[in-house]
Amino acid sequence: MSRAVHFPVPCPVLLGTLTDDSLEAQLHEYAKQGNYVKVKKILKKGVCVDAVNTLGQSALFVAALLGYVKLVDVLVDYGSDPNHRCFDGSTPVHAAAFSGNQWILSKVLTAGGDLRLHDEKGRNPQAWALAAGKDRSTQMVEFMQRCASHMKAVIQGFSYDLLKKIDSPQRLIGSPPWFGGLIQGSPNSSPNRQPKPGIISAQNIYSFGFGKFYLTSGMQLTYPGSLPVIGEKEVIQADDEPTFSFFSGPYMVMTNLVWNRSRVTVKELNLPTHPHCSRLRLADLLIAEQEHSSNLRHPSLLQLMAVCLSRDLEKIRLVYERITVGTLFSVLHERRSQFPVLHMEMIVHLLLQIADALIYLHSRGFIHRSLSSYAVHIVSAGEARLTNLEYMMESQDSGAHRDMTRVPLPAQLYNWAAPEVVLQKTATVKSDIYSFSMIIQEILTDNIPWNGLDGSLVKETIALGNYLEADVRLPEPYYDIVKSGIHAKQKNRTMNLQDIRYILKNDLKEFIGAQKTQTTESPRGQRYEPHPDINICLGLTSEYQKDPPDLDIKELKETGSQPHSPTDHSFLTEKTLAPQTLDSSLSAQEPDNPNVPSASRLAEEVRSPTPSEASLYSFEINEIYSGCLTLGTDKEEECPGTASSPEGDKANQVDELPSLEEELDKMERELHCFCEEDKSFSDVDTDLSFEDGDWQSDSLSSLSLPEPTREAKGKTSSWSKTDEYVSKCVLNLKISQVMMQQSAEWLRKLEQEVDELEWAQKELDNQCRSLWDASLRFANTKFLSAVGPPSLTYLPPVMQLSEPKQPENGGNWLTLARPPGNERDFQEGNFSKKSEKLSACDWNPFTQASEESRGYCSEPNNQPPTLCGPGKQNTGEQLPSTEEAKESLERNTNQNIRRMESVSSEVCDTKSRNNEDAGEARSKWRLAVKEMAEKAVSGQLLVPPWNLQSSFESKVENESTPLPRPPIRGPESTDWQYILEYQREKDELKGNMKFGKMENSDCDKNKHSSWTGLQRFTSIIYPFFRNHEQPEHNEASQASCDTXCGEKFYSTSSPIEDDFERIQSSFAQPQGYVEENFQIREIFGKNAEILTKPQFQAVQCAEDEQEETLEETPKELKEKNISLTDIQDLSSITYEQDGCFKETSCKTPKLKHAPTSASTPLSPESISSAASHYEDCLENTFHVKRGSTFCWNGQEAMRTLSTKFTTVRERAKSLESLLASSKTLPAKLTDPKRLCMFGGACSSNISTAFVTSTHSTKRKSLPGELAEATSQHHIDELPPPAQELLDEIEQLKQQQVSSMVSLENTAHDLNVTENDKKHLEEQETNSSKDSSFLSSREIQDLEDTERAHSSLDEDLERLLQLPEENMTLLDPTKGSTREKKTKDQDMVEQKRKKKEGIKPERRKSDSFLGTLEEDELKPCFWKRLGWSEPSRIIVLDQSDLSD
């Protein structure tokens, strides 16, 4: 006896045992020891070679797992099954793969082993081989790959001589996957000599692990049973028919395709799987069905025609004969509308075919186990086939049953399965009888067994001891069959399939005999009525046969007879009903024959069917057919002795038909009402139609009783026609029932859609309500009035331009680096009017002053963004002289005026709110200017305690959505799109704004969009300023640039600033932004109020400024009177406070530039040190303007730059030339090559120096009193300056003087150089220290400033005439009026200047020195500053620098 080999570790399975002393136990014991001699002796005694142990393992499995080569040879020679399934689903092929021995695996494969099978965990033999370890798995996996490659080569049609050279897997042992030659020899090969070719496969049967196959005489590769093996490309979709698929059980799907010009149905697995999925084992079901179907042949079994293999050989598809209708389950429960009536003859015929197929399977030793209505396939009308053999078991001689897959029955089939199958006990022939009885009950009651209960619940119910009983509604003899067949215990199922088939055949014979004879002496024959065509009851699919049923029904309507009836007058009677009996209606005859339900009762049942009644409609209709025939016999017995004659028959028919016609008309009206309701549902769901029910509706609408046929010799039976009419009524009622069920389903779907719509409407209402509540929260808030011209008296003129022309290029507006949506937002929103919603919140709309200021381009501007003046274009690299600048300015202004005329006219047409003529507007304007000037010189103007920031605060609070920020640069602006989209959605929801258009007609927008656009536009410089104002917080400051910051429009020194910042941050800033504000505030002290606020603001068009700064209700105007900013807008007097410029706007009809900054000269003395300081600040501003291209409006930029070049110098005689050259500088700045977008244009140092130096400039450009107060205010806050800083200041002055001299003489490149950046960084320190020593020289500075300003009166007045001349080009008449008005104002002011004296300077300085921060909040504070004194108004600065 051979020595036992140790069990390989790790092993995926355990080995079972047998403890008795039987031969099977000895077989397994010797198999474990590897003693093939003793095994051979035991097998000779007749022991089953596939006897299993406690784990379902055969001796071959044990030998292959332990690696006994000789023992495997013996067991295979004795016929052991290589695909035997253990209880865990594994096979000897799995065991051989795990052993690592190629010879053992080759022997198992040669015997028919399959490499595609899976165990219960979804593992195939290759997975078992990999589990054995790398040292043993490498050669084994390569061997399996060679077998697969060889099989592929054979399928793809390579030379079949290859099969003669390599006819078994043994010849692939140790061979590379090369098929021209053969390299033999392997350490794992068999000790025996290799067999010669042809010895193993003498019968041309081959197996390489993918099923047994052989070559026919025509060299066709086939499986046993002559099943062709085809490729997946050979099965295609037919061109002349639609795709038709249906489910054949829980896992399989059937599809109608074409193979080799034959119409077939292909079965495949329809279950998504993934690698290492346990559901991969379900693929074994197709292999098992292929095995069974290829070995079984019967007319009632679905014929397997071919096997389709995939390219990777892993998936197979089974090619069956064409199935036209589908499964019985789909006909009964899924597509019943296509088959409304199943007659008894059809039902019996189908049941007989299924019984024949089951009898054949049982005779071959197979048990179907999974018989259900899914397994019954109706291939054509009246022809059924049994399939789904994948769960079939084979009973052997020893009484054991062989399951090829070990896949448990799916729970979906428990409704038909026998209790022993559900509980996974041993299945027998009685199990199939139980399932067949379930099908009989299902087809007669239209109910799924167990009333459609879920399979898992069915199993629980059976486990608890509950079982089904036969339905009492079943007719005889089917009730007896079902009652006997569904007993819980198998021994009580006394009726076998032969007995059931005998009963069914007898019933069918009686039915057929009744069709042929139809005699009154045969009550059993009268139980059935012959149907006109079997296709009417069970037609084909809707694609193929729709016309034959229609034809038959029409034929039935027209003739009133059965088309396929043997005779039209088969009833030969001499007795007819009495006339009085014929007069009664069908409903009155109901008590006489309770078996025949009346038409009215049937209609009532259709209207309100119960679940139990609905399942029996098919059976009841068939009973009605037979019952109607027995009605005649019963009546004959009731009325004996009634005479009969042809004339009597005719008279009786004439009397009977009207009463029947009344009943039919009543049903027809009811069905018409139903059809009308049904049409309304077809409007909702257009996909649904009554294709199969159209002919029934037609028959109802055109139902008319034909004239009784006149047949010779009086052989026509009156009841035959009555039966026909009743049968048609019953058919129509059944159709109506189905249609009503469909309509109920459509109604349910419609109600669901309506509910969804209502829910969506509720959500929308809730959102609108929340937004409305948010807007009403600030509805009663009292806002401060806007500072500006009196809106009660001023109305802008309506200007009609003579040359409307579409602008070709919009170079007048600076284009920011913003997203397209923001660009449109700014262009549309900032030229918009107020909406009604905001008007309700005390926001008073203000009409735009000048339509010319709306001159933005209506077409997309593809030009680079420029900093042009009004119409100013790039005039070259050199700075021209004064005269050339004037000529160039006039030419370019004319060009741009012509461009803007068409836009202005269109905007005027769409946005102007009044139609007053220009003359009346100018007269009102002139009166308003004079009134304001009188109040100013008399000291009657009132000043609010602080700036109008609080009004904007309230307005920010009114907004329900956060204001988006303008984009910064690079990746920092990535979330701009999301913010903008959110803003768009909210705006569109509230009806405030309409995005997506840039035409001039879209200018009429609301106030909300104007405010939003202004916030976006005015918040562009602040991040740069904050980023570099505090170098040690560079990183945090840079992060703050990504946030959307709502900017303050005016600077304030009031105590409410902190509160306002917090409120505004809650709307527009993240938390990090607020924290950083306070960090900077802690470092810089109180001065951080100025440092952390935006010091400059992008200049916008006059309309934006007019809307945002001049919002004031009439009531507030009366209460608050007029403030100083009104005077600034009207007469160019700058109202400045706390070292900050304001965003102001010019309201004159003919000017588009912003109001100019002004100063008040005192005495014409020589230039002093104060002028020098003023000059330094202007030079700093010049440097910054030369180096940065912030977002200034074209016109504003020209005036800003031109006036910033105005420097108070000792050489007063060269002032005019200096100013003329400086006015041409903007042309240099507008060069597209040198212009930078906002996002990356300016360096941090330039931005810092620009803000800081201009802050100093603003303080020094104030009137003397304001400068003194401001400087004194900051002296207390700033630390004393260091000596080294003072030295640097003196050095900077000298450098700036030299740089200004070079600028006066030559026009050089205005790009910022590294030297300029260095100067600007140093100047930041200089400007921060100016306020510290300004107070010590304050009195002298004020006197010098007065003398400097007086000396330049005439020159600056000439400079001011340039904008007037430019605007005159738009309208010469109006331009002269404006010029005259300006001169008149100057004359009035000069006279008042002479009449009234200037108060002593001591009083002003004292008032400044004595002013506290709390006093600034009082309205009388500004009167104490000297603003009530008469002043001479001239212009030094036309820039509109704002926050």
From Swiss-Prot:
Q: Where is this motif: GPPX3Y?
A: 788-794
What SUPFAM superfamilies does its record include? Ankyrin repeat, Protein kinase-like (PK-like)
One GO BP annotation here?
negative regulation of cytokinesis
Post-translation: what modifications? Answer: Phosphorylated on Thr residues by CDK1 during early phases of mitosis, promoting the interaction with PLK1 and recruitment to kinetochores. Phosphorylated on Ser-431 by PLK1 during late prometaphase promotes the rapid depletion from kinetochores and its subsequent degradation by the APC/C complex.
User: Motif D-box at which residues?
Assistant: 886-894
The record places domain Protein kinase at 199-512
Give the residues the record marks as binding ATP. Answer: I205, Y206, S207, F208, G209, F210, G211, K212, F213, K267
Does the entry feature the keyword NAD, yes or no? Answer: no
- Annotated positions of the Phosphoserine modification: S175, S186, S431, S561, S659, S1054, S1214, S1350, S1351, S1405, S1442
Gene Ontology cellular component terms for the protein in this record:
cytoplasm; intercellular bridge; kinetochore; midbody
Q: Does the keyword Cell division apply?
A: yes
Span list, region Disordered? 547-614, 635-654, 852-886, 902-922, 1253-1273, 1318-1410
Q: One Pfam family of this protein, by short name?
A: PK_Tyr_Ser-Thr
Query: Mainly localized where?
Result: cytoplasm
Subcellular compartments = Cytoplasm; Midbody; Chromosome, Centromere, Kinetochore
Keywords attached to this Swiss-Prot or TrEMBL record, sorted alphabetically, are:
ANK repeat, ATP-binding, Cell cycle, Cell division, Centromere, Chromosome, Cytoplasm, Kinetochore, Mitosis, Nucleotide-binding, Phosphoprotein, Repeat
Q: Give start-end positions of Basic and acidic residues composition bias.
A: 547-558, 908-922, 1376-1390, 1397-1406
Composition bias, Polar residues:
559-570, 578-598, 872-881, 1325-1337
- The ANK repeats are at 27-54, 55-84, 88-117
Molecular function (GO) terms for this protein are: ATP binding; protein kinase activity; protein kinase binding
Q: Which family does it belong to?
A: Belongs to the protein kinase superfamily.
Its assembly, as annotated, is: Interacts with KIF23 and RBM44. Interacts with CEP55; inhibiting interaction between CEP55 and PDCD6IP/ALIX and TSG101.
PANTHER family given in the database record:
INACTIVE SERINE_THREONINE-PROTEIN KINASE TEX14 (PTHR23060:SF1), TESTIS EXPRESSED GENE 14 (PTHR23060)
What information about domains appears in the record's comments?
The protein kinase domain is predicted to be catalytically inactive. The GPPX3Y motif mediates interaction with CEP55.
Q: What does this protein do?
A: Required both for the formation of intercellular bridges during meiosis and for kinetochore-microtubule attachment during mitosis. Intercellular bridges are evolutionarily conserved structures that connect differentiating germ cells and are required for spermatogenesis and male fertility. Acts by promoting the conversion of midbodies into intercellular bridges via its interaction with CEP55: interaction with CEP55 inhibits the interaction between CEP55 and PDCD6IP/ALIX and TSG101, blocking cell abscission and leading to transform midbodies into intercellular bridges.
This chain belongs to which protein, by name? Inactive serine/threonine-protein kinase TEX14
Q: Which organism is it from?
A: Rattus norvegicus
